[in-house]
Each structure stands twice: as structure tokens, then as C-alpha cells.
């Protein structure tokens, strides 16, 4: 990925993102706020802050269904990337949360993505990123 002012990498999301099903193409680019990236629709109307859940939760085991991976034609482990959407609508950085229940899964070789629903019940839509 490239810096925030550049184009980034374009990914197709055939099913869109939950709540944004009509938006099918996103660009993922680096953010100046590491370890976060920006996932922005190509028309720039919608954007999300995303990061790897492994940046703050080493043992994230979402149990993503095999069908979800096959929907984006991801078979080999080196093709698979998992990201989570970050909620920054807070007054204090300690209250930043990540959606671990519905991760973004990506086939980085075929440039395809999907929002999956993880079957592991221990994860929530608002997992605190920073421990107090």
C-alpha cells in the first residue's frame, strides 16, 4: 500500500459492505495514523478506518466460514487478509473500538473483498482497541 495522498490498492467487493451494499469498489491506502489504513469507496463518498485485528489482539480466532473465503476465491493462507473496521466516534482514544464480529476479508492476490460474519460468539461489534 502507498501513502495517504496516493491512490492505494483497488479491491472489488461484489456484495458491498453491510449497509453499503451498492458500493462495490474500495481503495485501501495507508493512513498517517499507524497502524490504521483507510478503506475508501472509489467515488470517495464513504470511507472506513481499518486495521488488522492482530495489531491489538494476537489471538483473534474469528472462525470465518469456508464459504466466505471461497466467495472471494481465497484458498491459500498467503492470499488471505483480515481487517476490522474501527469506530473513532469517541472523545477519548481509549474508547476507540473495532468491529470484530464482522471483519473485512480480502484475497490480496485477486483483489477481492467481502465483509464476513464471524461465528465465534466471544467477539463483538465494539471491542475496545486500547486496554485501560
From Swiss-Prot:
GO biological process, any: bacterial-type flagellum assembly
Top-level taxon: Bacteria
Cytoplasm in keyword set: yes
Keyword Metal-binding among record annotations: no
Keywords on record: Bacterial flagellum biogenesis, Chaperone, Cytoplasm, Translation regulation
Compartments in which it is found: Cytoplasm
GO cellular component: cytoplasm
Pfam families listed in its UniProt record: FliW (PF02623)
Main subcellular location: cytoplasm
Subunit structure and binding partners: Interacts with translational regulator CsrA and flagellin(s).
Biological role stated in the UniProt entry: Acts as an anti-CsrA protein, binds CsrA and prevents it from repressing translation of its target genes, one of which is flagellin. Binds to flagellin and participates in the assembly of the flagellum.
Family membership noted in the UniProt record: Belongs to the FliW family.
PANTHER family: FLAGELLAR ASSEMBLY FACTOR FLIW
Name this protein carries in UniProt: Flagellar assembly factor FliW
Organism this protein belongs to: Borreliella afzelii (strain PKo)
